């Protein structure tokens, strides 16, 4: 099967005439890797099929939400029942309360929660809430971490710690990003210096505990510990963006793993998405009662949404969370994910190709490097041309990974040992050609 497959190409041409770049989210366009994107017609379990009918083992999982795989029976039943009752009411429902209870039961740092429709909306709202609760304007984020496409977060680093960021997108005024300071991930000294210079003005620090848009880079325990200490010391809020990691790497999210290493650790605000919607447009942000009660209608921080708490989306999310809360779920998922990375590493080593990887729960990443990077500049050392060859070799062999060098991958409960073995077999052949 060639890169420009018969039926995907004309679909892409039709799409490009009507939709900018032919896609509704840029990474789907294959611009980073070249070739024609696959237009998916259906999915089931661990598999997707494109317009040509080619089957792929799916390691994107809709960029993370499909932790149970596609078309899980319990989720389908819940969604079908909810759809028959009504698509949207613009009024409260019991299921919103049930979903909030389920999330809070597993993520105790979230004493209260607000449901929204996307990770971008949740991150944007969390920043507004942090600013409103602290009566401060400045925020600290980290190079390589992605928190959605809200204006104040589309920022790259300035020339130094005394210089705030520059917009990474046209259409974002400098006046919007002038309060955002961008630091290097896992750099404790830089974070300390930033608070020395700007501490009284910092509303929050926002970070991914595992940076999935750097492929897979963990926040070190000392870095996370110091971020918590500095926020507490200076009266800033620590915002943990678990849109990708929440319920994906552990039932309590990545923050539950850090709490095992850092006694008493908890963020002030948590941002969730992806898995909590089970594939439907649903996200959330939450935190302590004192902070969350700053939101309208109780407090002065405004936030609203026509489709927030959508009854079909909440049904999908609730059914998903109830399935993944069953005993042994994460042990099995984590073992399968580890087997994938170990298999890929072994296949690469046999071919003399440098590859290192990491996993947590159902999330993984690998780099064509001899050792794991700790920040964005180190991630950039990956061989992009070699990755593109690997990507297309896997795709032609029926294995669908992210069409971008810096994106994490995902294993679902539907992936079998045979799926992992088949993936490694395809990769073994491709590595021999790199």
Swiss-Prot record:
Protein keywords: Cytoplasm, Isomerase, Porphyrin biosynthesis, Pyridoxal phosphate
HAMAP family: HemL_aminotrans_3
Cofactor(s) listed: pyridoxal 5'-phosphate
Cell compartments where the protein resides: Cytoplasm
Organism in which the protein naturally occurs: Acidovorax sp. (strain JS42)
Gene3D superfamilies: Aspartate Aminotransferase, domain 1, Type I PLP-dependent aspartate aminotransferase-like (Major domain)
PTM-bearing positions, type N6-(pyridoxal phosphate)lysine: 274
Family: Belongs to the class-III pyridoxal-phosphate-dependent aminotransferase family. HemL subfamily.
One Gene Ontology biological process: protoporphyrinogen IX biosynthetic process
Molecular function GO labels: glutamate-1-semialdehyde 2,1-aminomutase activity; pyridoxal phosphate binding; transaminase activity
Quaternary state and interactors: Homodimer.
PANTHER family membership: GLUTAMATE-1-SEMIALDEHYDE 2,1-AMINOMUTASE, GLUTAMATE-1-SEMIALDEHYDE 2,1-AMINOMUTASE 1, CHLOROPLASTIC-RELATED
Catalytic activity entry: (S)-4-amino-5-oxopentanoate = 5-aminolevulinate
Annotated protein name in UniProt: Glutamate-1-semialdehyde 2,1-aminomutase
Pathway info: Porphyrin-containing compound metabolism; protoporphyrin-IX biosynthesis; 5-aminolevulinate from L-glutamyl-tRNA(Glu): step 2/2
EC number: 5.4.3.8
A GO-annotated cellular component: cytoplasm
Domain of life the protein comes from: Bacteria
């Amino acid at each position: 099967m060639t890169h420009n497959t018969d039926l995907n190409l004309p679909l892409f041409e039709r799409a490009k005439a009507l939709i900018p770049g032919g896609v509704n989210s840029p990474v789907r366009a294959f611009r980073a890797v070249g070739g024609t994107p696959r237009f998916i017609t259906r999915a089931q379990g661990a598999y997707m099929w494109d317009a040509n009918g080619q089957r792929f083992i799916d390691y994107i999982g809709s960029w993370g939400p499909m932790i149970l795989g596609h078309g899980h029976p319990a989720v389908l039943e819940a969604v079908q029942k909810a759809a028959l009752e009504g698509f949207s009411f613009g009024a409260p429902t019991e299921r919103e309360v049930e979903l909030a209870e389920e999330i809070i039961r597993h993520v105790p740092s979230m004493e209260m929660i607000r449901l929204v429709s996307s990770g971008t909306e949740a991150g944007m709202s969390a920043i507004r809430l942090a600013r409103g609760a602290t009566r401060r304007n400045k925020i600290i984020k980290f190079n390589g971490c992605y928190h959605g496409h809200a204006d104040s977060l589309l920022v790259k680093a300035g020339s130094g710690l005394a210089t705030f960021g520059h917009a990474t997108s046209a259409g974002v005024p400098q006046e919007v990003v002038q309060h955002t300071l961008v630091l290097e991930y896992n750099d404790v000294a830089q974070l300390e210096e930033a608070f020395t210079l700007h501490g009284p003005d910092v509303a929050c620090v926002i970070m991914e505990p595992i940076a999935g848009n750097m492929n897979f880079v963990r926040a070190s325990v000392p870095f996370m510990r110091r971020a918590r200490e500095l926020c507490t010391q200076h009266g800033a809020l620590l915002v943990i963006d678990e849109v990708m990691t929440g319920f994906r790497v552990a039932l309590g999210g990545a923050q539950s793993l850090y709490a095992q290493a850092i006694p008493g650790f908890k963020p002030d605000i948590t941002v969730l998405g992806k898995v909590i919607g089970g594939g439907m447009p649903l996200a959330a942000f939450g935190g302590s009662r004192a902070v969350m009660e700053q939101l309208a209608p109780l407090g002065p921080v405004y936030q609203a949404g026509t489709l927030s708490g959508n009854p079909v989306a909440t049904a999908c999310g609730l059914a998903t969370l109830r399935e993944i809360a069953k005993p042994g779920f994460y042990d099995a998922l984590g073992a399968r994910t580890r087997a994938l990375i170990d298999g890929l590493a072994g296949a690469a080593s046999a071919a003399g190709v440098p590859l290192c990887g990491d996993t947590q729960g159902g999330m993984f990443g690998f780099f064509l490097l001899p050792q794991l990077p700790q920040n964005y500049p180190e991630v950039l050392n990956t061989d992009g041309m070699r990755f593109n060859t690997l990507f297309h070799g896997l795709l032609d062999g029926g294995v669908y990974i992210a069409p971008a060098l810096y994106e994490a991958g995902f294993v679902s409960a539907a992936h079998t040992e045979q799926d992992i073995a088949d993936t490694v077999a395809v990769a073994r052949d491709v590595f021999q050609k790199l």
